[in-house]
Swiss-Prot record:
Superkingdom per UniProt: Bacteria
Keyword Transport: no
GO biological process annotation, one example: translation
UniProt keywords, alphabetically: Ribonucleoprotein, Ribosomal protein, RNA-binding, rRNA-binding
Source taxonomy: Bacteria, Pseudomonadati, Pseudomonadota, Gammaproteobacteria, Legionellales
Species in which this protein is naturally found: Coxiella burnetii (strain CbuK_Q154)
Name this protein carries in UniProt: Small ribosomal subunit protein uS11
Length: 123
């Protein structure tokens, strides 16, 4: 069976959503079409280990390798969303996969006193 042909995309955008329970990374082209996706849960981490920085780094290394090998991607802009623990380590994982980070943007949604927040945890 022949290997699937991918189109060449040299620059892309990495969308990182870091929640407290998981970290999702998707790589798209400049128009926003998703090329590849990986999460910490999809990288083999289960339960509370999905929300760790190590899980985010492994997922971003995998998605970075996919983007580099399949789409010949070299440069990437990063958009981070969410308060999770895997924010910085996901960016580090993309760099270690051989991608050059050209732009870094924080898109965490902040309410202008909108909905009432969740109750405080009592441990």
């Amino acid at each position: 069976m022949a290997k699937k042909r991918y189109r060449k995309v040299t620059e892309g955008i990495a969308h990182i959503k870091a929640t407290f329970n998981n970290t999702m990374i998707s790589v798209s082209d400049s128009q926003g079409n998703v090329l590849c996706f990986r999460s910490a849960g999809g990288s083999g981490f289960k339960g509370s280990r999905k929300g760790t920085p190590y899980g985010a780094q492994m997922a971003s290394e995998e998605v970075g390798r996919l983007a580099r090998d399949n789409f010949d991607m070299r440069r990437i802009a990063v958009r981070v969303k969410g308060p999770g623990a895997g924010r910085d380590s996901a960016i580090r994982g993309l760099r270690s996969a051989g991608l050059e980070v050209i732009h870094l943007e924080d898109r965490t949604p902040l309410p202008h006193n909108g909905c009432r927040p969740r109750k405080k945890r009592r441990v």
